[in-house]
Regions:
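A short helix-loop-beta-strand connector motif used in the catalytic cores of GNAT acetyltransferases and
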Residues: 45-56, 87
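Conserved active-site alpha-helix within GNAT-family acetyltransferase domains
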Residues: 104, 116, 128-146, 151
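Conserved beta-strand in the GNAT
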Residues: 56, 62-71, 87, 92
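Conserved acetyl-CoA-binding loop-helix of GNAT-fold acetyltransferases
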Residues: 93, 99-112, 139
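A short beta-loop-alpha structural element at the N-terminal edge
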Residues: 2-16
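Conserved acetyl-CoA binding element of GNAT-fold acetyltransferases
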Residues: 79-95, 125, 147-150
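Conserved GNAT acetyl-CoA-binding A-motif
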Residues: 114-125
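Conserved GNAT-fold acetyl-CoA-binding loop/helix
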Residues: 22-43
């Protein structure tokens, strides 16, 4: 297995992986999300963006996982320190390849991407119900930073 930056030629192989991530979200929070395919423009913008990348795990010529990253700059405010951090927007590994170090390799690649750009941190959001993901991130040394509350059925 190797980790590399995606190219436009990878778009078709990436579509089912992004769809798998969206499917997981829809299963965990069906009132908030629905299954869908990620549009090609979004995928290609991540690949070609000046402040973004899609990192892929490839095995035997097939993409088995992805990590979508982009830079976020927090503008200075009297109460806020200006900084740029890496947002890990999506990380997804095909089910057949989970628990084999693929996700950790992608997370490490995202971290290296952020460090190479001198980002202050690597941040992500995950659904509270996604216990597997939360365990994965905590085992990787990440910590919970913010909690979002929601009041539904208004």
């Amino acid at each position: 297995m190797r980790i590399r930056k995606a190219t436009i030629e990878d778009t078709e192989q990436l579509k089912p992986l992004f769809a798998g991530s969206l499917r997981n979200m829809a299963q965990l929070q069906p009132r908030q999300y629905r299954e869908a395919e990620q549009d090609v423009e979004f995928i290609q913008a991540g690949i070609l963006g000046e402040d973004s990348d899609v990192l892929v795990a490839e095995k035997d010529g097939h993409i088995i996982g992805l990590a979508s990253v982009f830079s976020v700059t927090v503008k200075p405010r009297p109460y806020r320190v200006q900084q740029t951090y890496c947002e890990l927007d999506t990380i997804f590994v095909q089910e057949a390849h989970r628990n084999q170090g693929v996700g950790k390799a992608l997370l490490d690649a995202a971290w290296n991407w952020a460090k190479a750009l001198n980002h202050a941190s690597l941040q992500l959001m995950t659904l509270g119900e996604n216990e597997d993901a939360r365990r994965f991130y905590e085992r990787a040394g990440m910590r919970e930073h913010k909690i979002v509350y929601i009041l539904e059925n208004l």
